[in-house]
Amino acid sequence: AYYRSGYAPTDFPTTAEWTGRWLVEKSRAIAVPSLAYHLAGCKKIQQVLANPGVVERFIDDAETAARVRECFVGLYPLDNTSQGMQATRMALHEPHKYVVKPQREGGGYNVYGDDIPKLLTSVSEEERKGYILMDLIRAPPFNSVLVRNGEVVVASVVSELGIYGIFVSDGKNVVVNKQGGHLLRTKAADVSEGGVAAGFAVIDSPLLI
């Protein structure tokens, strides 16, 4: 059972959708993704994993856990906890240092810069819990050549490397858990969003050394 949709809260407007999701999960079908893997990709779960001591629950070796943490940027809740209220103040005070992310995938949903205060002051406290705050990653730009709509464009760009993972489990029994390739997305340096499907970025080819 492959989920082409179902990655946004709006995809589950009634209990019928939740019942259907749970029915697939309980069946003998292979769910892609499984409910656990689906949750692991949610922005809120990623934010929780960045909390002190959480990664260490899953990685016993302290040195390895520390190396994993070196890859993290700041991730903060936007709820009504003291940490969430502090993050809200940070975002309102210096919005250009952050990006606000909803529980959605596909590109085009993140909020940047001057739009952050507009969002945070327009949503309710309950709605704000559905977002997280992340430090804005400022990748070093470089010059490259893009082909868009059949036209050759020379531009200052930045790239984002994603690593595919293959994970198959049967309950708590992990059958396969390995790296399965990569995806390099490149976009103009002055563009905030980075989704290929949403038209913000192009698929690139890295030189692997």
Could you say what each language-model-derived stretch is?
Residues 2-208:
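Domain-scale recognition of functional cores that engage charged ligands
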